[in-house]
């Protein structure tokens, strides 16, 4: 192994030298005290987890999980292809189809798998299909399109004019699919969904939208931005996750019967892997049902988002301004971003993980703040004042949001 260890060590050392080495903190979350967690025998406040609404600890969701555990046991017993469908996963798929006003749905073990295996399989099902993908699409989308080996075009981030030019360059009779996200996880910007839908109609293309960061949070029932804009019925495939706003785990797609059935019969990421256990699918179903009728969590969430953004404006903290709940604080240097994260945790009891290249472009290294309904005014003030002190200590300049947005967009274009 010595020869191979040398290769591994060289790879690790290179990442360390670039300030990109990732250390995973050992945390103990507290279901009865969200958003607190225990770290090295100290209580800390978490500001970076994707349990957006705290549904992982909601009493209805936890009780549903307990009941399913006692009724069905821990595991699912295998693949659906061999072991069949547990009734709980069929109920979940019915809820998801209704959530997005689609005929049916298909559940996967994660959002990554849902994107990866669905997109790769579409290329097997539809001969000569051409992919059109936003340049900042998630790694799971990139993986699926890449493994499909199909013809692909990458359009500039959120640039519908560039997208149209690329569409114009392809034979109108060739099958096409436009793949994009409703909200981009690292900058929080929304896609121009209606413009993309119009282009898809004009150039005879399918549409595939990733709503993982918006389901549960936007729309009357929590159906995401497509529901908020009342255009779910104009999008061919809506993909989402159960692991963020719904507080469990898993991913899914929703569409018409024929498309879903074709994916079910083709996608290796569905066929050859153990299905979600009933303890998870049942909990997810109850989480979705609750958020379909309750706006309390969404309203409180938006209130906290607004308060935090106002606080950052007041202290001139350089966050990337957007219309979503995702609040990136741009540091612009990998070493300093890591230091800010470590100082917040060790000196102030605040946990915010830094985000460095390759997750974001070089020069736009950042902290990504994720507010929840459980974050208090005191927590907001503590975070803001801690950042001001740390920025001063590390000689990081405070800058206006307007100047920052221009600077970051130039990085993205470059």
UniProtKB/Swiss-Prot annotation:
EC number: 2.3.1.37
Transmembrane segments: none
Cofactor(s) the protein requires to work: pyridoxal 5'-phosphate
EC class: transferase
Residues where N6-(pyridoxal phosphate)lysine is found: 244
Keywords attached to this entry: Acyltransferase, Heme biosynthesis, Pyridoxal phosphate, Transferase
Keyword Acyltransferase: yes
Catalysis: reaction(s): succinyl-CoA + glycine + H(+) = 5-aminolevulinate + CO2 + CoA
Residues binding pyridoxal 5'-phosphate: 185, 213, 241, 273-274
Active site (catalytic residues): 244
Family that this chain belongs to: Belongs to the class-II pyridoxal-phosphate-dependent aminotransferase family.
Quaternary context: Homodimer.
The protein's name in its UniProt record: 5-aminolevulinate synthase
């Amino acid at each position: 192994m010595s020869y191979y260890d040398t290769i591994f060590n060289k790879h690790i050392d290179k990442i360390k030298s670039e300030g990109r080495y990732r250390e995973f903190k050992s945390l103990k979350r507290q279901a009865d005290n969200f958003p607190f967690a225990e770290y090295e025998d100290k209580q800390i406040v978490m500001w970076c987890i994707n349990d957006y609404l705290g549904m992982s600890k909601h009493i209805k969701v936890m009780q549903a999980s307990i009941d399913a555990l006692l009724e069905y046991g821990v595991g699912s017993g295998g693949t659906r292809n061999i072991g069949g469908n547990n009734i709980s996963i069929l109920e979940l798929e019915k809820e998801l189809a209704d959530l997005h006003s689609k005929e049916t749905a298909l559940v996967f073990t994660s959002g990554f798998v849902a994107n990866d295996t669905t997109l790769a399989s579409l290329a097997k099902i539809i001969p000569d299909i051409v992919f059109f993908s936003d340049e900042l699409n998630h790694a799971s989308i990139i993986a699926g399109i890449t493994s499909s080996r199909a013809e692909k075009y990458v359009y500039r981030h959120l640039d519908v004019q560039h997208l149209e030019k690329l569409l114009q360059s392809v034979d109108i009779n060739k099958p096409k699919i436009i793949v994009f996200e409703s909200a981009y996880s690292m900058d929080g910007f929304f896609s121009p969904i209606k413009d993309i839908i119009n282009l898809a109609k004009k150039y005879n293309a399918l549409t595939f939208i990733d709503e993982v960061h918006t389901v549960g949070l936007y729309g009357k029932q929590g159906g995401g931005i497509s529901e908020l804009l009342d255009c779910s019925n104009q999008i061919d495939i809506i993909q989402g996750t159960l692991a963020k706003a719904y507080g469990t785990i898993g991913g899914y797609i929703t569409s018409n019967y024929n498309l879903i059935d074709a994916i079910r019969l083709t996608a290796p990421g569905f066929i050859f892997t153990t299905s979600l256990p009933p303890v998870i699918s049942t909990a997810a179903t109850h989480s979705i049902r609750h958020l379909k009728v309750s706006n309390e969590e969404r309203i409180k969430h938006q209130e906290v988002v607004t308060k935090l953004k106002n606080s950052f404006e007041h202290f001139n903290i350089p966050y990337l301004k957007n219309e979503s709940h995702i609040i990136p604080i741009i540091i612009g240097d990998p070493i300093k971003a890591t230091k800010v994260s470590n100082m917040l945790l060790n000196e102030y009891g605040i946990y915010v993980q830094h985000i460095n290249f390759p997750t974001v472009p070089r020069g736009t290294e950042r902290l990504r703040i994720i507010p929840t309904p459980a974050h208090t005014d005191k927590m907001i003030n503590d975070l803001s004042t801690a950042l001001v002190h740390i920025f001063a200590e590390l000689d990081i300049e405070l800058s206006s949001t307007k100047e920052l947005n221009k600077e970051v967009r130039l990085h993205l274009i470059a």
